[in-house]
A protein has these predicted regions:
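Fe(II)/2-oxoglutarate oxygenase catalytic core
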Residues: 1-127
Length: 127
């Protein structure tokens, strides 16, 4: 295909250029998603999370709930965001847990065996 190129103002450094030199991939391999306002009521979710029982485990930093919380519609919402089907929703032991970390604790960046991971931040006015 022959490249088409139009410069609205070729004599200056301003203006715009229309071109077919590059195009977007029609089927990108998305590996990262951001969803704002995930919960309808994040303050209530946070209050609920703060009332749960957390335990300390030497295997990771911070505190986590022992219980897993699978709230109605969350799996489907994540599937919609990713445009993928989640097949082992309840099988992975870290799924649906609340975690709490204190300010100043440096996170440990790592990779587990699952294909995807998600985090919902509930700290109000976080930096």
């Amino acid at each position: 295909m022959k490249n088409k190129h139009f410069d609205s103002s070729p004599q200056t450094e301003y203006g715009y250029i229309n071109s077919n030199q590059f195009s977007a991939n029609p089927l990108p391999n998305n590996r990262f998603w951001v969803a704002e306002n995930f919960y309808n009521n994040p303050e209530e979710v946070r209050d609920f999370a703060l009332m749960q029982w957390y335990h300390d485990d030497p295997g990771y930093l911070g505190l986590r709930t022992r219980k897993q919380f699978f709230f109605e519609g969350v799996k489907e919402k994540i599937e919609g965001i990713m445009n993928k089907t989640i097949t082992k929703w309840e099988d992975y032991e870290m799924n649906g847990r609340f975690q709490s970390s204190k300010a100043g604790i440096k996170p440990v960046y790592h990779c587990d065996s699952q294909q995807y991971a998600a985090a919902v931040y509930l700290t109000p006015n976080a930096p």
